[in-house]
Amino acid sequence: MLDHRTETFMAVCSVMNYREAAELLHITQPAVTQHIQFLEKEYGCRLFLYENRKLIKTPAAQMLEDYLSSVQQRENFLREKIKNNGLRELRI
């Protein structure tokens, strides 16, 4: 399960537009900006830049996107494996 900030990051990577990512996630554009700024501070680098009014990913953003995509795929695989093996019941 990804953190809401990393989900925001992945949405921005998908549409390459803060406003469209906000609409996709049903949050405000300033919230998207805050999430990206948090991640930039956390990792100590810029994730996106503007070139000629176009949003582009930095190399760090590409690395993070690749990593998070892998995490999402593995989580989906695990969910399916648990679902298909009938391991839904949690006993305490």
Regions found by a protein language model. Name each.
Residues 2-8, 29, 61, 89:
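The N-cap/first-turn positions of alpha helices
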Residues 9, 21-22, 58-61:
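Hydrophobic two-helix hairpin corresponding to the core of helix-turn-helix DNA-binding domains
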Residues 11, 23, 41, 48, ...:
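Regular, well-ordered alpha-helical segments
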Residues 12-26:
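Short helix-boundary/capping micro-motifs
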Residues 24-25, 36, 43, 64:
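Core residues of bacterial helix-turn-helix
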Residues 40-57:
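A short LG(V/I)-centered, amphipathic sequence patch enriched
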Residues 83-92:
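Interdomain hinge and pocket-entrance segments immediately C-terminal to HTH DNA-binding domains
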